[in-house]
Amino acid sequence: YEKFKRMMELAELPNTAMKLHGLGEIADRPGILQPDYQIENIPPFVEMAVEAFGPKRLMWGSDFPPSAGREGYHNALEGIRSHPALSGGEDAQEVMGRTAARVFGFGSR
């Protein structure tokens, strides 16, 4: 994970945020649209990103339409929403929308 580890160094810059998307792209590929796709098959990139950036500087992206042919949109969504590294609740809400709203200025009028 050397390239990903180097990317985590960007977290030292306080004005940077990171988008988590396409996790099925970096995981072992399941058969197309298997409902039992396990997010645990993904390398520890989410854990590394949460440790480096924290939930308030991470945002989820669907990677749709490519995710539809890999892990499926539902699995991509639930994989992050319920990821153990986000401990549910506030952390997951930050990643699933609040960070993007802050970064892009949504609702700031």
Where do the model's predicted regions map?
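Active-site metal-binding loops of divalent metal-dependent hydrolases
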Residues: 62-64
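Mid-to-C-terminal alpha-helical segments outside catalytic/metal-binding sites
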Residues: 47-48, 52-59, 68-109
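Catalytic pocket-lining loop regions of alpha/beta-barrel enzymes
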Residues: 1-59, 70, 108
